[in-house]
Structure formats: C-alpha cells, structure tokens
C-alpha cells in the first residue's frame, strides 16, 4: 500500500479520539500537540499531565518548536515500548521528525502514527480501540490492520526465550481472527444482498399494489371480473394468487434477513470472546514460559542432586570401614565447635571490653572537651595577666637599671675615696719616715682593716660604703626570685581581670543585641501603626483574617481527612513490604544452606581424597578420572550457584525498583493532594491575606533575628571550641 494512503487512513483513525487540538490533516498534526494528547488518552499512567505540560502548545510556524515537540513524542513512544510493553523495535525505520517539522512529510508522519497505533493496540484499553477500528470503513480497517501486522512483525520481546508453542498459539488465534473477519465480511455481503433483494421485492410489492388498486378499480367498474368464465376474471384470480405468493416471499425474506442479522451479532460476540480468549492465552503462555523455565531449572537441579547422591553413596560405601577416621572427624568437629565457641566468647568479651572502653573514651572525650573549654578560658585570662605582668616587668627592669646605675656610681665614688685614702697615707708615711712598716700593712680596701692614721670621718664613710656595697650585692642576687614571685602575682591578677572583662564584654554585647532587636521591633510597630486613620483598616483586616483563618481550618480539615485516607492505605503497602522482606529472608536462608552444603561437600571430598591416598596409593592413578569427574561436578554446581546468585540479584533489583516506584507514587499522590489543598486555599483567600501573611513573616523574621543575635556569641564560641 502507498505510504500516502496509509497516512490518510491513520489520520482518519486518529479522528476517532476526542481531542481538543485540531487533527484533521497532516498540517494539524505537524506540531505534535494532538498526538501527545492522544498518547495521554491511550496510557494516562505513563504519559502524565507533567509530560504533556512539556509540549509547547503555541508552536505555530516555528518549525524548531514543532521539531522539539515531535522529538518528545517519539522518545516517549519508544520509552513506552521498552519500559511498559517490554518490546524492542528492531527493523522498523524510525520517523524523521525534522522532515515532518519542516516539510510536513506524509511518509514520516505515517511512520510516527503507526508507532502510536501500536501503543493503542497494546495498552490496557486495547479492546476499546480495536472495536473502534472494527467500526471504521472496510478500506481504512484493512489498512490499519496491515499497519498493525507490519509493526508486530518488526517487534521483538526485550527478554529472550519466547516459546514456539506460544508463537504457534498466537498464529492460530490470528488465523481464527482472520477467518472470523472473513466470515463477518461474507455475512455483511450476504446481508447487503438480502437488503437489495428486499428493496427490489418492496418495489415490486408497491408496483403490485398499484396494479392491484387499478384492478380493484376495474373490478369495481366491471362486476363481470369475478366471473371465472371471462378472461378478465381469470386474470384477476391469477393476479391475486401472484400477490399472495409475493407477500409470502417478502415475509420469508424478512425473516431470513432478521436471522442473518442475529447471526451477525452472534459472530461479533464470538469475535469479542475470541479476543478475550486470545488475551487469556497470551497470559497463560507467559505463565507457561515461566513454569517451564522453573521446571528446567528444577530438572537440572534434580539431575545434579541425583548425581551428587550417587557420588555420596559411593563414598559412603568406601568409608564404611573407616570408623576410626569418622571418630577422629567427629572429635575434630567437636574440637572445632569448642574452639569456635571459645573464639566467639573471646570475641564477645573483647567486644564488651571494647564497648566499655568506648563508653569510657566517650566520657573522657566529653571531659576533655570541658577541660579544653576551661583551658581556653584560662588561656585568655593568662594572656591578659601576661600582658599586665610584662608591663610590671618592664617597670621592675627600669627600676633595676636605675639601681645598677646607682651602684656603679657608688663604686666609682668608693674607688676615688680609696685612692685618696692611699695618697694621704703615703704622704703621712713619707713624712714620718716609717715607709717600710706602712707599706707592708697596705692591702685591698675591701678586706683589709682601715689604717689607724685615716681620719675618723673618712673611716665612717668607708665603713658605710662597704655595708651599702654588700647590701646591694645581696639585693642583686635575690632580685630574680622576687621578680618571679612578682610576675606570678601580676599574672594571676591579669588573668582574673581578663575573665571579668570577658564576661562583662559578652553580657554587654548580648544586651546591645537585645536592645537592637527591641529597637527594630519598635520601629516596625510604629511603621505598622502609622496614623490613627489606619486603625479602621486594621480592624477590617482582622475580620478578613478571621474569615480566611476559618477557610484555612476547613482546608486543613479536608487535608487531614485525605491524610487519614493515605494512612489507611499505607498498611497495605507495609504488609506487601513485610512479605517481600520475608521472601528475602527465606532466599538468604536458602543461599546460606547451599553454601553450607557446598562447604560440607568440599570438606568431605578432601577428607575422602586424603583417606584414599593414605589407604591405597597404587589406585591414585586409576582414581584421577573420578576426581576429575567430581571436579567437573563441583564446577557445574558453582556455575549453578552463580546463576542463582545472578537471578537473585535481578530479583532484588526489580524489587527495589518496585519499591521505589511505590514510594514515588505515594509521594506524588501526597504532593498532588497538598497542591490541591494549597490551590483551594489560595483560591478561597484574597490579596489582603497575602499582605497580612507578609507582615506576619516580617515579624517572624525580626523575632528570629533577635533570637539568633542573642544566641550568637555562645554559638560562635562553641564553634571555635570544636574547631
């Protein structure tokens, strides 16, 4: 069939939908709005309102917007085939949306409409759409059925392994449908022929009635017609017989037509029954496929278990004479169990000790955090006291420097006096002539006795200077200890003063922030109050606010009812989740049993190998094929286990996807209900309500700012402490 005719037939099929967008011609369908609306009617669960909202309604002559809409429609249809229907279109040429958007290409439009037709005949409401197709014209119906057949031939299931029996049943049902369709066409043709015959007979009947009327007139005119001896009478009798025969034949034809109409209705009912049976057969085919797969898996597992049982029997026969080995095995098992229990107890004790240590460490960490906070406070105090002590130390050092300078000056004066004393003594000795005796008595001025020839004033002054010199030396030696004690006292004073100043500073900052918040609140209240003329407006606003609050309470009550309905539905979901959890636990338990059996088999196999090697070393060469066969069986079992694990992972992924879909559906439903409640609230509310809520938000913002400002210093200190 020509692609143009196919496109026209599909456009006629699309006209069976009740669409708001224009959809009479290819140009009307070029923007993709009508097709997206039809997809929303075909599968509203998949093509939702949010998806339809992405379609640009005002594309007009802008071919780029039309191309964007058509791309969204094409990707949505392909995703529906792969995700919902589980089919992949292999050899079907996808439509070129660019040529449709630019040139309104009829061939590409026909391909796109053919894909939408496939979605319609495979969706949940496919029976309704098939009935609509059966009610169309014969040529259009034939073209649409050919398009469906072409699309079904190029579809392939996403999961391989479709049974040939199912395909055979599908072909049989398709052949039955074709036969029923042909029988329907024959019956329709027969009904048409009967209608034509009835119409002809009705025309003949009308003619005969006219002729009868004429003859009756003639009979009335001529009474001699009733006489059979005359030709007119014989003609009259013959015509009356013909009229009676024609009436009987018309009655018979009408009854036949009614019978054929009833048969046609019965055939249509049979067609519907066959379509339902076809769906049931498809479902049964899928179930049989799953059951056959399970039977194959169970058959393979049964064969492998029988092989394993045979091998176990052979090993049992070989191990009947090895009682000592069994005893040792049992002893080893008991010992391993005892060791495992001991290890488990040790681990439990270690875990308890570690838990107690962890609790102790947590307490220590908390104590250390407290100590760190105290130490930070002490450090701040110590810093302030250190500053004060450094200032005091500077003053003490200056005082020390002054004393050192004074000491140096006193030393110089002492040396000068000593020199003067020596000069005076020498002069006196020279004058008396006792040079040798006096020269032997002259010694160091500090440690020697003062000569008797020195005058008493100078002697007193020298003694006083020596005493002062000794005192200065002792004071210089003890100044370090005194400085340390003084600096420690100054440091304590500085620390105490620093703590006091910090607390005062924080209290002052908090008081300043509180006063700022109060000032802002007073300013906002003054701005809200304004002039006395606004009091009336505030009263009206309060009344409106009360009305809106009542409406808001009604909306909240409705929302609460909807939430209760959702809460009533949630136990069903929780019960299904519990069932899934139980099945998962059973599956995990079976996996653990399989792993334990596999480990036990391996252990028995290794022990048997070691026993065979120790008992009969000559048969090691002959037993290698058996060992190889056992290895092959183990590899097959490992492959089976890997296959089961992959199936388990797939089932787990599908279950997680189902849970995500359920959760997303619940969230979407809750969001829609919340959105409806908010929209109803906004529709019932007015502009005054928005203004009032804005003022309320401003008050809340100022109050929050006040609370944050009051709590900020402590919070900042805690953040610094954590860092």
Curated annotation (Swiss-Prot):
InterPro entries: CH_dom (IPR001715), CH_dom_sf (IPR036872), Hook_C (IPR008636), HOOK_N (IPR043936). GO terms for cellular component: centrosome; cytoplasm; microtubule. The keyword Manganese does not apply. Its main location: cytoplasm. Keywords: Coiled coil, Cytoplasm, Cytoskeleton, Microtubule, Protein transport, Transport. It comes from the Eukaryota. Residues 696-711 have a biased composition (Low complexity). It holds the Pfam family HOOK. Residues 682-723 are annotated as: Disordered. GO terms for molecular function: dynein light intermediate chain binding; microtubule binding. The keyword Heme does not apply. It is found in: Cytoplasm, Cytoskeleton. Residues 162-423, 457-665 form a coiled coil. GO terms for biological process: cytoplasmic microtubule organization; cytoskeleton-dependent intracellular transport; protein transport. Residues 4-120 form the Calponin-homology (CH) domain. May function to promote vesicle trafficking and/or fusion. May act to link a number of membrane-bound organelles to the cytoskeleton. Belongs to the hook family. Interacts with microtubules. This is Protein Hook homolog. It comes from Branchiostoma floridae (Florida lancelet).
